[in-house]
Regions:
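Sequence signature of WD/YWTD-type beta-propeller architectures
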Residues: 19-297
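Bacterial Sec-dependent N-terminal signal peptides
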Residues: 1-20
Length: 297
């Protein structure tokens, strides 16, 4: 596998007067023939990414180009533990014409797999913190340890019947800042410092609020938003003609909603960003199944 560096004049633009993220270069990662990825997740240190290629999870070493298959049974949704050793992912299974979701973990060093949540009909969401995974399954909160230490309580933002739920210290509450009547919330996550919630409100855009739902602030029309750090979020602005995506770009916004920056141009077809916890890289995929990396200065 080789890397292709693309011209920033072609793919990236920014607001020079108020730059939130300083993009140094954009790389296209050439995947093996026939491999198309639908999503990616960055490791915390930016050294590797994991891609989902039609259910096959593959670890891509960004320095050497080495690709290692991790699992063959994924559906969607992935997270990597803070130490970079464990991947959490969702697996869909079907029984009696009903769809169930397993939440699984796999050790990236030895391949050992574990099931954290088994055969859920309503896995609302999950989050990782240090050695623990917090998951909300049909309103019930559980915490599981990824090693031999006792699990800690992880703050989780999740969705139930379109409403925004936040679980703090194992207690779940419906915080839906804009209410629930006629509203649908998506893509919730808790900030790295555990103090704020980022979410997307269908038809309205992305917002940041407090853990209790107070003080919702618009951070712009971006979908699939992710935390870059405690002060900046990133997401995608995609366009379509009703049948397929015609353009998509990555954008960044300050959490107060006052500054927005383009990270790529609309022609880049950039979708579904994932951020390395150290801020060094942002990965994205395209409708063609390609994997790109933004290297941050």
């Amino acid at each position: 596998m080789r890397k292709v560096f693309l011209s920033l004049a072609v793919l990236a633009s920014s607001v020079a007067s108020a730059q939130l993220v300083n993009v140094g270069s954009i790389e296209k990662i050439n995947l093996p023939s026939g491999v198309r990825t639908i999503e990616s997740v960055m490791s915390p240190d930016g050294s590797f990414a994991v891609i989902n290629a039609a259910g096959s999870l593959q670890k891509v070493d960004l320095a050497t180009g080495k690709i290692v298959k991790i699992a063959d049974d994924a559906s969607s949704g992935m997270e990597i533990s803070k130490d970079g050793n464990t991947l959490i992912y969702e697996q869909s299974v079907f029984k009696d014409k009903l769809r169930y979701t397993n939440l699984k973990s796999v050790n990236l060093n030895n391949g050992k797999e574990s099931t954290l949540v088994n055969a859920s009909r309503n896995l609302q969401g999950y989050a990782l913190s240090k050695n623990s995974v917090g998951a909300v399954d049909n309103g019930k909160y559980t915490a599981k340890s990824l090693n031999s230490a006792a699990p800690s309580l992880v703050t989780v933002a999740s969705i139930k019947a379109g409403a925004l739920i936040v679980s703090v210290n194992g207690v779940s509450n419906n915080i839906s800042p804009q209410g629930t009547t006629g509203q649908s919330y998506l893509w919730p996550s808790v900030s790295p410092d555990g103090k704020k919630v980022l979410y997307y409100l269908c038809g309205e855009g992305a917002f940041v609020c407090n853990l209790d739902g107070s003080n919702p602030v618009s951070v712009g029309m971006m979908r699939a938003p992710k935390w870059y750090n405690n002060k900046v979020v990133v997401g995608m602005q995609d366009e379509d003609n009703g049948d397929y995506v015609t353009g998509s770009k990555l954008v960044a916004s300050s959490v107060d909603g006052k500054v927005m920056q383009d990270l790529t141009q609309i022609s880049s077809m950039a979708m579904y960003p994932s951020v390395a916890a150290n801020g060094s890289k942002v990965s994205f995929v395209t409708p063609a199944g390609e994997l790109f990396i933004l290297n941050i200065k």
